[in-house]
Amino acid sequence: MPTITVIVPTLNEVENIDLLLKRVLSTRQSCSIDFDILFVDSASTDGTCDRVLDWQEREPVHLLRLDTNMGLAGAVIAGARYTSSKYILVMDADLSHPPEVIPKLLRPLLEGTDDMVIGSRYVEGGSIPDWPFSRKLFSRIATLPALIFCGVKDPLAGFFAVERRKLTELSDSVPGFKIGLAILAEYGKDLRVTEIPIEFRDRDFGESKMNYWVVFDYLKQLLSLVFKRVGRKG
């Protein structure tokens, strides 16, 4: 089994599966890094699982079906516990994260120079070309509270690579979408982190999962991290 598994959480992403896998597998073929791809599906109803199973017959692609929607964080943790790879790379299914950057996120882990590598929108060279100024401003403001728990510029990024045990040791109750923030907060300054610039693109197909519940879960996560930090100091 490969040392690396790319985990892709899905919920009704059938329109993106083929496009994503063509680019991910092309990247895999062109680089010297071997990895497999694990889709963790949260009870999709649009044929996402059937599409993944079609690919599973001929490529290093696997499917883990969850009975309920556990949220992105829960899906990623479930996927990390399902596989036995040493390293995990997490990315979205909607092609907002460029698959061509996968080798850049993995090499520092394999070389032992970093513990976590983040595909960042906010370091020099990173960009969000599809977003209007108002949305970029809102994203920056939303990022500010998370900076309390870490020293990276894009702590809310969902595109990152990390040692698997950093995920499996997290609590099952991590809320919402910001699994990367949970890792950064849990391991703190002991974690060697590098940010790699990426061009973050909006999805072309399917429906965005961003809604008021996502914002609520993020606020709940921030409060949980605050209480946890206060408890440690106490």
Task: Describe the residue ranges of each PLM region.
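N-proximal low-complexity "stem/linker" segments adjacent to membrane-targeting elements
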Residues: 1-26
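Cell-envelope/extracellular polymer assembly enzymes that use nucleotide-activated donors
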Residues: 3-5, 36, 182
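Donor nucleotide-sugar binding loop of glycosyltransferases
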Residues: 13-17, 44, 98
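Conserved donor nucleotide-binding strand/loop of the catalytic core
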Residues: 35-38, 49-82
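A conserved acidic beta->alpha catalytic loop
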Residues: 41-50, 95
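Acceptor/aglycone-binding surface of glycosyltransferases and processive sugar-polymer synthases
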Residues: 66-82, 87, 99-177, 203-216, ...
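Catalytic donor-sugar/metal-binding loop of nucleotide-sugar-dependent glycosyltransferases
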Residues: 172-175, 184-201
